């Protein structure tokens, strides 16, 4: 229930029945407008002159007319219960005939009650009008302002003759107006909903609440977003622009940020200035160092011009790009991203070789077997396998060349066998012919026997043994005959034939 603070000057004339001019209706829309209860500038003297008795506080009708000169119809039309909107009533156009002969004017303000639960704030108008009706001469200087706790003093000062300001903290009033205070509307009505505006006679748009910012994160490269994710991106408010890649899809992000490169360049230049003069004399330009890429020895660390700026790291490099790549190890920066699987890399060559796993490209082929590889180091590692196989084949070929001289000595082993064989055959020959008769010696049989024996063995064994046996067994000329036979039927002549 709202408590009304009334500051009015009431005339001595009181009305016995103040509610006679009000239509008894349960809704707010049936109450007549407050300016219809006042005398207009043209009709004010007629009502005052007809109803004021003698001895009252008014001298004449002229004085009453002058008293309301400043109250015009335009001034009353600006007044409203909520300081912003007026209740439009088309059904009470003829209610002026029911107005009382005496009217009043005044200034009042309504303040909310702390322990009130009733939301029908127009009800205090009954108690206000029932006890305070009359005529009064009000000056703007004598009318006090509203209480300091009310924040609607600026709106009440817009209509000095008669104004009304209402401030309600209830969460769901029946008749609520859009607030015009400078602060945020969410502080006055924290749980306010726009439904009461739809049920009011004159709908007003709901107060502008601060829109909470969405926390939707757009990926770095939105080329591979799914359709539902692209729809979510459109929900982002206009003031929150997504990444620049959304505007121009063809533009790809830079591999290394320019700010990072400049920071490293300035830092390395400052580091060069702080190097001692002894080291400055030994500095070699990177361009001259690149003339000897295959030299066996590297540049000593103290002669490398680009040092790592991290205090705990003593690494130095001959090239600035090597230093930039090394600093990413400390910072953890991975500016190179795969556009297919969104994986990040710290080096561009790592990204290049990684993309080949998606595309299936294998540009490096083996020169020996023709096998293809996606990376050059994989081909190098594969080539070492072929080199090891060649070394194994070379090791197997050396024992075969050593075994060939052994086979050349095989005839010497067979030389030990011919000596006993001719002795076994020579003895029967000498014993079968003990007679000294030369004509009885069977030469054909002897000739047949010896060639068969001598053909299987070497010649030097045959010639040595039979000749000595024959000379020892016979002293007759038969020895010469046997020697001649052995010479004629020697294996040498047989081999030649």
Curated annotation (Swiss-Prot):
Compositionally biased region (Low complexity): 139-165, 397-441
GO cellular component: a single term: nucleus
Pfam families: DUF3432, DUF3446, zf-C2H2
Sequence segments annotated as region (Disordered): 139-169, 175-194, 286-309, 377-441
GO molecular function list: DNA-binding transcription factor activity; DNA-binding transcription factor activity, RNA polymerase II-specific; double-stranded methylated DNA binding; hemi-methylated DNA-binding; promoter-specific chromatin binding; RNA polymerase II cis-regulatory region sequence-specific DNA binding; sequence-specific DNA binding; zinc ion binding
UniProt zinc finger (C2H2-type) residues: 306-330, 336-358, 364-386
Domain of life: Eukaryota
Residue ranges of the TM segments: none
Gene3D superfamilies with a match to the protein in the record: Classic Zinc Finger
Induction conditions: By dorsalizing and ventralizing growth factors during mesoderm induction. Responds to the FGF-induced MAPK/Ets-serum response factor (srf-elk1)-signaling pathway. Induced by activin and bmp4 acting indirectly via an FGF-signaling pathway. Induced in response to wound-induced activation of the MAPK pathway. Induced by both t/bra and foxa4/pintallavis alone, with maximal activation requiring both transcription factors. Induction by t/bra is indirect and probably occurs via the FGF-signaling pathway, whereas induction by foxa4/pintallavis may be direct.
Family in the record: Belongs to the EGR C2H2-type zinc-finger protein family.
Function: Transcriptional regulator. Recognizes and binds to the DNA sequence 5'-GCG(T/G)GGGCG-3'(EGR-site) in the promoter region of target genes. Binds double-stranded target DNA, irrespective of the cytosine methylation status. Regulates the transcription of numerous target genes, and thereby plays an important role in regulating the response to growth factors, DNA damage, and ischemia. Plays a role in the regulation of cell survival, proliferation and cell death. Mediates responses to ischemia and hypoxia; regulates the expression of proteins that are involved in inflammatory processes.
Comment field on protein domains: Binds to DNA motifs with the sequence 5'-GCG(T/G)GGGCG-3' via its C2H2-type zinc fingers. The first, most N-terminal zinc finger binds to the 3'-GCG motif, the middle zinc finger interacts with the central TGG motif, and the C-terminal zinc finger binds to the 5'-GCG motif. Binds double-stranded target DNA, irrespective of the cytosine methylation status. Has reduced affinity for target DNA where the cytosines have been oxidized to 5-hydroxymethylcytosine. Does not bind target DNA where the cytosines have been oxidized to 5-formylcytosine or 5-carboxylcytosine.
Protein's recorded name: Early growth response protein 1-A
Organism: Xenopus laevis (African clawed frog)
Upper lineage: Eukaryota, Metazoa, Chordata, Craniata, Vertebrata
Gene from which this protein is expressed: egr1-a
């Amino acid at each position: 229930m709202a408590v009304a603070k009334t500051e009015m000057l009431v005339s001595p004339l009181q009305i016995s029945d103040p509610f006679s001019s009000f239509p008894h209706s349960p809704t707010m829309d049936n109450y007549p407008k407050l300016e219809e209860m006042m005398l207009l500038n043209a009709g004010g003297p007629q009502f005052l002159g007809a109803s004021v008795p003698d001895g009252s506080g008014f001298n004449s009708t002229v004085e009453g007319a002058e008293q309301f000169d400043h109250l015009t119809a335009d001034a009353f039309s600006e007044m409203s219960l909520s300081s912003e909107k007026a209740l439009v009533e088309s059904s009470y156009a003829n209610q002026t005939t029911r107005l009382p002969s005496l009217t009043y004017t005044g200034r009042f303000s309504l303040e909310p009650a702390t322990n009130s639960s009733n939301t029908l704030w127009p009800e205090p108008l009954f108690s206000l009008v029932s006890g305070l009706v009359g005529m009064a001469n009000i000056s703007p200087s004598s009318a006090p302002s509203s209480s300091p706790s009310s924040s609607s003093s600026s709106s009440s000062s817009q209509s000095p003759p008669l104004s009304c300001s209402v401030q309600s903290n209830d969460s769901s009033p029946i008749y609520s107006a859009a607030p015009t205070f400078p602060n945020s509307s969410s502080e006055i009505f924290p749980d306010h909903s726009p439904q009461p505006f739809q049920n009011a006679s004159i709908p007003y748009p709901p107060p502008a609440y601060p829109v909470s910012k969405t926390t939707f994160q757009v990926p770095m490269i939105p080329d591979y977003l799914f359709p539902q994710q692209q729809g979510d991106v459109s929900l982002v408010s206009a003031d929150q622009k997504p990444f620049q890649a959304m505007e121009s899809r063809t533009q790809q992000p830079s591999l290394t940020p320019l700010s990072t490169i400049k920071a490293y360049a300035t830092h390395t230049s400052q580091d060069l200035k702080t190097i001692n003069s002894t080291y400055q004399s030994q500095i070699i330009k990177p361009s001259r160092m690149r003339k000897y890429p295959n030299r066996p020895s590297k540049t000593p660390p103290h002669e490398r011009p680009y040092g790592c700026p991290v205090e705990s790291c003593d690494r130095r490099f001959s090239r600035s790009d090597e230093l930039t790549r090394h600093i990413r190890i400390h910072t953890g920066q991975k500016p190179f991203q795969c556009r297919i699987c969104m994986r990040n890399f710290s080096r561009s060559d790592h990204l290049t070789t990684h993309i080949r796993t998606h595309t299936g490209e294998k540009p490096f082929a083996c020169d020996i077997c023709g096998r293809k590889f996606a990376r050059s180091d994989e081909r190098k590692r594969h080539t070492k396998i072929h080199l090891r196989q060649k070394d194994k084949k070379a090791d197997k070929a050396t024992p075969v060349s050593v075994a060939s001289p052994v086979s050349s000595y095989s005839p010497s082993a067979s030389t030990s066998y011919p000596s006993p064989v001719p002795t076994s055959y020579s003895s029967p020959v000498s014993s079968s012919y003990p007679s000294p008769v030369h004509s009885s010696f069977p030469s054909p049989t002897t000739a047949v026997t010896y060639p068969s024996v001598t053909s299987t063995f070497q010649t030097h064994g045959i010639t040595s043994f039979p000749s000595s046996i024959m000379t020892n067994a016979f002293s007759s000329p038969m020895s010469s005959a046997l020697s001649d036979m052995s010479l004629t039927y020697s294996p040498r002549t047989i081999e030649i034939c």
